[in-house]
Amino acid sequence: FVKNSGICETTPGVNQYSGYLSVGSNMNMWFWFFEARNNPQQAPLAAWFNGGPGCSSMIGLFQENGPCHFVNGDSTPSLNENSWNNYANMIYIDQPIGVGFSYGTDDVTSTVTAAPYVWNLLQAFYAQRPEYESRDFAIFTESYGGHYGPEFASYIEQQNAAIKAGSVTGQNVNIVALGVNNGWIDSTIQEKAYIDFSYNNSYQQIIDSSTRDSLLDAYNNQCLPALQQCSQSGSTSDCTNADSVCYQNIEGPISSSGDFDVYDIREPSNDPYPPKTYSTYLSDPTVVKAIGARTNYQECPNGPYNKFASTGDNPRSFLSTLSSVVQSGINVLVWAGDADWICNWLGNYEVANAVDFPGNAQFSALDLAPYTVNGVEKGQFKTVDNFSFLKVYGAGHEVPYYQPDTALQAFKQIIQKKPISST
C-alpha cells in the first residue's frame, strides 16, 4: 500500500495509508486509512462501511465524513473541517470483494458470509499496524449497514470470545461502539413504515388516505405474511419471495407514485446531490496510481448485489442481532435523517423501540427530546444506558453530507463511549 499519497487528507502531519490487504485466497480488500487529526496516538479506531449491498465505502469517504469532500461541483476535493478523523483514526473499507477498488474472488452471498472477511481485514490491518490493537474500535455504517453493522459487531464479539477460549487464533478487537444511520434492519417494521412515512412526514405528503388504506391492506395480506414465512423457514425461496412481494406491493407503487428522490424527499428524482463528482475523480489515472489502486473503481457493481439478492438477504431481520449487540454493553446509536424515504427515520425509530435490552421498557416509553449542537436544535433524541436514537432534521439518507456538524458531534459522543447529549 501507499503511505501519504497526498490525495484527500492534506492536513500537515496527518498520515494516511491506502491499498490492499489479503482476506483470503485471491481476495484483495481495499482500505483507505487516515490518522486522527488530533492526538492520533490515543484516538480510537473507527471503520466506515457503506451499504448496498455491494456499494463502496469511498461514497462515505468523499461524500459524507472523510477528510475531503467535493464542494459545489468542484472537480477536485477540498478539506472537510467536519471530517470524522478529527476525533478518530478512520479506516474506510470496500467489501465484499468486487466492490469499489477491491478485486479478486467474491464468494460472499449474504451479510452473514460477509462478516468473516471483514474480521480477516481487521486482523491483517493489526498485523501491519500493531499499535492499533489495544485501541477502542467502533463500526459506523448506513443503509444496508442496518444488516452489516449488527452482524459485523456480533461476529467480532463471537471471535473475541473464541480467542479468549483458545479455539480461535487472532487478535482481540476491542469493539466499544456501533452506529447505524438510516439503516435497513427489520423489514416487518420498515415496510409498514414506508406507508406511514409517505402519508405523514415533515416535508410532503406522498400518498393520500385512500392509497394509504389500500397499501395497508396489501401490507397485511401480502407483504407481512411473506415476511413471516421468510422469518419462520429461513429458506432462500421464501425470503427471495418476500423481497419481491413487498417490493411489488409497497415500495414499488409508492416510489413511482410521485417525482421525489427516495434518498431525500425534498428533491425531485433527478436530484444532483450529493454530487457524484468523486467517482469521476477516482477514475482519473493519476489519482488511481497515486493511491495504489490496481483496478477500475466501481461504486455499486451489480455482481455482489445480485449474490445477496439470490439468497433473499434483504428481508432477513437483524433486529435480534442488534439486540444482542446492545445487550453486550457496547455503545449503540441508531440514527436517521428525517428527509430520507428509503430507510426513513420512522422505521428506524420503531426498530429502536423494539430493541430487546434491559432498558427497553424505559426506552420505548421515553419521548424524544431536542438535540442541540452549540445551542441550536438539530434533531431529537433519547437515550437509556448504552443505547441511543437520534432523528436529524434537514438530512437525507447520507446524514453527514447534509448535517456535518451534527453528525460529527454524535460520532464523537458515541466513540467516546458516552450517551449522546445536547451541547
Swiss-Prot record:
Entry binding sites for substrate: C343, E398
EC number from the UniProt entry: 3.4.16.6
GO cellular component labels: fungal-type vacuole
Pfam family for this entry, one: Peptidase_S10
Catalytic activity: Preferential release of a C-terminal arginine or lysine residue
Gene3D superfamilies on file: 1.10.287.410, alpha/beta hydrolase (3.40.50.1820)
GO terms for MF: serine-type carboxypeptidase activity
Residues bearing attached sugar chains per UniProt: N200
Disulfide bonds: C8-C68, C55-C300, C223-C246, C230-C239
Annotated keywords: Carboxypeptidase, Disulfide bond, Glycoprotein, Hydrolase, Protease
Active site residues per record: S143, D340, H397
First-tier enzyme category under EC: hydrolase
GO biological process annotation, one example: proteolysis
Family label: Belongs to the peptidase S10 family.
PANTHER family: S1, PUTATIVE-RELATED (PTHR11802:SF453), SERINE PROTEASE FAMILY S10 SERINE CARBOXYPEPTIDASE (PTHR11802)
UniProt-recorded name of the protein: Carboxypeptidase S1
Organism encoding this protein: Penicillium janthinellum (Penicillium vitale)
Lineage of source species: Eukaryota, Fungi, Dikarya, Ascomycota, Pezizomycotina
